[in-house]
């Protein structure tokens, strides 16, 4: 396994790769959710590149970039055991120049839900993902459905900019109790982990209602809010179609139900596709 810390080192390492390239971009602090992406990419491609880069431009004022969990040695071992060919671990100066051109999230889809609560977050995310996709020369890039709005925007970016890469959505990985895996879960104590299960329980409640014939969005949200009373603060419940347009009625096969809530220190998100 090659560790590339500069763009030049990555470009040199890629010269040894022949065939399809799978790419998994991460911010490190790898967990089983990341590993599932890596394993799928390994299975479906001749070669595999993983990036580990805590991107400063997607952190907002007041969000502590320096507090984001970093476990470089552990992450490297996970990648090595998983059979990754190249791990790209650049410093900030490798990824950004002063006064560079920027791309931005679309005015509507990029500034609702996560984009409304964290304005500018998706601008920074799309900027770095475009750079990483170009640098990796990926045939396929793998993203989890847990960040559903991010996945939607990346897919749109690739289409709008005619980028020659296939975006592969991957299922949400949960722990044995149903909590969606996240690097931010390390901030939860045992009591908070138990309360955090309210997110997945609220989504299960919504799914059960839909399966029983209840399609009214407001009725479903009301039931979900009751389940989410165990959280410290609910930031949003949203029921949208795959293009992130708000719905009045659930459309089977074209609906995403999303929730964001605070539990102790971290802000957690979860969703289900119906």
UniProtKB/Swiss-Prot annotation:
It comes from Sulfurovum sp. (strain NBC37-1). The reaction proceeds by a bi uni uni bi ping pong mechanism. The keyword Ligase applies. Beta-alanine binds at residue 58. InterPro entries: Cyt_trans-like, Pantoate_ligase, Pantoate_ligase_C, Rossmann-like_a/b/a_fold. This is Pantothenate synthetase. (R)-pantoate binds at residues 58, 150. GO terms for cellular component: cytosol. It is found in: Cytoplasm. GO terms for biological process: pantothenate biosynthetic process. GO terms for molecular function: ATP binding; pantoate-beta-alanine ligase activity. It catalyses: (R)-pantoate + beta-alanine + ATP = (R)-pantothenate + AMP + diphosphate + H(+). Homodimer. The active site is at residue 34. Its EC number is 6.3.2.1. Belongs to the pantothenate synthetase family. Pathway: Cofactor biosynthesis; (R)-pantothenate biosynthesis; (R)-pantothenate from (R)-pantoate and beta-alanine: step 1/1. Pfam families: Pantoate_ligase. ATP binds at residues 27-34, 144-147, 173, 181-184. The keyword Nucleotide-binding applies. Keywords: ATP-binding, Cytoplasm, Ligase, Nucleotide-binding, Pantothenate biosynthesis. Catalyzes the condensation of pantoate with beta-alanine in an ATP-dependent reaction via a pantoyl-adenylate intermediate. Transmembrane segments: none annotated.
């Amino acid at each position: 396994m090659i560790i590339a810390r500069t763009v030049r080192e990555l470009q040199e390492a890629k010269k040894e790769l022949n065939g399809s390239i799978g790419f998994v971009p991460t911010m490190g602090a790898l967990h089983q959710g990341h590993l599932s992406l890596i394993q799928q990419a390994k299975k479906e491609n001749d070669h595999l590149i993983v990036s580990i880069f805590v991107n400063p431009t997607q952190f907002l004022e007041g969000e502590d970039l320096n507090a984001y969990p970093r476990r470089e040695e552990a992450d490297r071992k996970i990648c090595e055991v998983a059979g990754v060919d190249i791990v790209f671990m650049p410093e900030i100066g490798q990824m950004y120049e002063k006064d560079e051109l920027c791309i931005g999230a679309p005015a509507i889809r990029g500034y609702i839900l996560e984009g409304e609560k964290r304005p500018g977050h998706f601008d920074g995310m799309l900027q770095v993902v475009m750079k990483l996709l170009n640098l990796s020369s990926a045939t396929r890039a793998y993203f989890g459905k847990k960040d559903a709005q991010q996945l939607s925007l990346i897919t749109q970016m690739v289409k709008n900019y005619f980028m020659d890469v296939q975006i592969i959505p991957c299922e949400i990985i949960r722990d044995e109790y149903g909590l969606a895996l996240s690097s931010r879960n390390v901030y939860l104590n045992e009591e908070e982990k138990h309360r955090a299960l309210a997110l997945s329980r609220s989504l299960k409640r919504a799914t059960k209602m839909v399966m029983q014939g209840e399609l009214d969005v407001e009725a479903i949200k009301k039931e979900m809010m009751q389940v989410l009373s165990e959280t410290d603060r609910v930031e949003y419940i949203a029921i949208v179609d795959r293009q992130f347009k708000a719905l009045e009625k659930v459309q089977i096969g074209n609906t995403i139900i999303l929730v964001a809530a605070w539990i102790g220190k971290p802000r957690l998100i979860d969703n289900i596709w119906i």
